[in-house]
A protein has these predicted regions:
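Short, surface-exposed coil-to-beta transition loops
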Residues: 12-14, 63-68, 89-94
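A short, structured loop/turn motif at beta-sheet edges
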Residues: 20-24, 71-76, 96-106
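Hydrophobic pocket/interface hotspot
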Residues: 26-36, 70, 81, 107-109, ...
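Low-complexity, charge- and small-residue-enriched intrinsically disordered regions
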Residues: 56-59, 63, 128-139, 170-185
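Beta-strand/loop substructures that line and gate deep hydrophobic ligand-binding cavities in soluble
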Residues: 85-137, 142-144, 148, 153-154
Length: 190
């Protein structure tokens, strides 16, 4: 009897922010991901994004329960992280930049994956709203880094704060190898 393929649920989630600056200026923010002075990821309020080495092909990292490896990297242009945990997330997330007229660049985050059956109820209920909030706060951080302010800052929801409190008990940063780029704030710094 033939084995039927496991059904999956596609997810494609994109966040974009038009920022002042050329490709190199805005693209430099990508280089700081997972570092001590990460200009994008809001590690002070969220489980930090960490990398187990330099920003390079093959470097592993994660945030919260997600674990991934850099599978595509173009300095100051693109970094793509392919998930390997949790197993129900099959795909990647990436940060990229593209020009948007004179003196402006779009910083984009894209999440493209297939959810296995276990992920169907888990991701939309427990993680999607958190994902949207952390990425928008990260884009706020990028805007603040470039301009000194944020025109329309994202306000975190109380429900997401409660979700983070519950999930934070289960998904602490467990440490990486000795060369890990650890954020200066958040659970990893403790």
């Amino acid at each position: 009897m033939p084995t039927l393929p496991m059904p999956t649920l596609p997810v494609h989630n994109v966040h974009r922010r038009r920022l002042p600056g050329d490709l190199d200026t805005v693209g430099a923010l990508i280089e700081g991901l997972g570092g001590a002075d990460d200009p994008i990821w809001p590690a002070h309020d969220w489980m930090p994004l960490w990398l187990d080495g330099p920003m390079a092909l093959g470097t592993t990292g994660g945030h919260g329960p997600a674990r991934y490896r850099i599978v595509s990297y173009q300095p100051r242009r693109l970094v793509r992280f392919r998930f390997h945990e949790p197993s129900f997330m099959i795909g990647f997330h990436e940060f990229s930049v593209e020009p948007d007229g004179p003196g402006h660049t779009v910083l984009q985050h894209a999440l493209t994956m297939q959810l296995g059956p276990v992920g169907w109820p888990v991701f939309p209920v427990a993680f999607l709203a958190l994902h949207n909030e952390v990425i928008e706060m990260g884009l706020d951080g990028a805007e603040r880094r470039l301009t000194g302010r944020v025109r329309r800052p994202v306000t975190g929801s109380r429900l997401n704060a409660a979700r983070r409190a519950v999930l934070g008990r289960y998904f602490e940063y467990t440490g990486a190898g000795p060369g890990a780029r650890r954020p200066s704030t958040g659970p990893a710094a403790r």
